[in-house]
UniProtKB/Swiss-Prot annotation:
Keywords: DNA condensation, DNA replication, DNA-binding, Early protein, Repressor, Transcription, Transcription regulation, Viral DNA replication. The gene is 6. It comes from the Viruses. Residues 1-19 bind DNA. This is Histone-like protein p6. The keyword Electron transport does not apply.
Amino acid sequence: MAKMMQREITKTTVNVAKMVMVDGEVQVEQLPSETFVGNLSMEQAQWRMKRKYKGEPVQVVSVEPNTEVYELPVEKFLEVATVRVEKEDSEEQVAE
């Protein structure tokens, strides 16, 4: 049996709506859901949606975080992963 690597990942599905004028009345138009890696708050999701739909009146309706455990055989991980190179102290100081 192959050795497996496991990682718990949280993704957040953001449901968003847009306000539109139809015959002089404001109506809500549901937009496609967006999924982001991480556990986003309503405020974080609203900020991201405002950036995506610049200038449009959008409102986040709900955020739905979902955490799942993913696994991958170690051999496959080694095929696709890259070796992390540690930065030297002088490089880190310049970056700051």
